[in-house]
């Protein structure tokens, strides 16, 4: 069984992330979506909330597991016997950054981790979690940018931020 890992902060998960997850399942048999905390980011949703948003979207899927990890991703992958890392790419900037990480992950894992890059579908190239949060903050429609199952959660959080 081929098990892949798709990691990110997912604050919140977008249709772009969802598209990468669904397309990754054409490559691997099982995908572990790993929610990570980046110490340089300020989050709208805490770790458990982000995991719950993802779980809500993929509820009932036997092919997707949602997990969390603090630390090096290669350590999580070794612990879970995974060697396929899935990365979505929106543009050349993403490619440049992720290519560097792929070399580092390969070295840190003693050659065990291979990174598979999946280009973002054209309709999601400009969609990011930051973009979604900005739309939500200004009470704009999130339809088409996030799954319908999580729109209310995101709009409610935006309302809290607006005060």
Curated annotation (Swiss-Prot):
It catalyses: (R)-4'-phosphopantetheine + ATP + H(+) = 3'-dephospho-CoA + diphosphate. The keyword ATP-binding applies. The record marks 17 as: Transition state stabilizer. Substrate binds at residues 9, 41, 73, 87. Pathway: Cofactor biosynthesis; coenzyme A biosynthesis; CoA from (R)-pantothenate: step 4/5. Keywords: ATP-binding, Coenzyme A biosynthesis, Cytoplasm, Magnesium, Nucleotide-binding, Nucleotidyltransferase, Transferase. SUPFAM superfamilies: Nucleotidylyl transferase. One of its GO terms (cellular component) is cytoplasm. Its EC number is 2.7.7.3. Coiled coil: none annotated. Its main location: cytoplasm. Belongs to the bacterial CoaD family. Homohexamer. This is Phosphopantetheine adenylyltransferase. It comes from Fusobacterium nucleatum subsp. nucleatum (strain ATCC 25586 / DSM 15643 / BCRC 10681 / CIP 101130 / JCM 8532 / KCTC 2640 / LMG 13131 / VPI 4355). The gene is coaD.
């Amino acid at each position: 069984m081929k098990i892949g890992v798709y990691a990110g902060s997912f604050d919140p998960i977008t249709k772009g992330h969802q598209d990468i997850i669904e397309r990754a399942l054409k490559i691997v048999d099982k995908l572990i979506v790993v929610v990570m905390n980046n110490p340089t980011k300020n989050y709208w949703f805490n770790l458990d909330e982000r995991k719950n948003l993802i779980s809500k979207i993929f509820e009932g899927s036997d092919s997707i597991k949602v997990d969390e990890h603090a630390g090096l991703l290669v350590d999580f992958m070794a612990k879970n016997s995974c060697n396929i890392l899935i990365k979505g790419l929106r543009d050349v900037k993403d490619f440049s950054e992720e290519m560097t990480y792929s070399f580092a992950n390969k070295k840190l894992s003693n050659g065990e981790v291979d990174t598979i890059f999946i280009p973002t579908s054209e309709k999601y190239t400009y969609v990011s979690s930051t973009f979604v949060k900005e739309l939500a903050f200004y009470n704009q429609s999130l339809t088409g940018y996030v799954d319908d199952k999580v729109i209310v959660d995101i709009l409610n959080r935006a309302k809290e931020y607006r005060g």
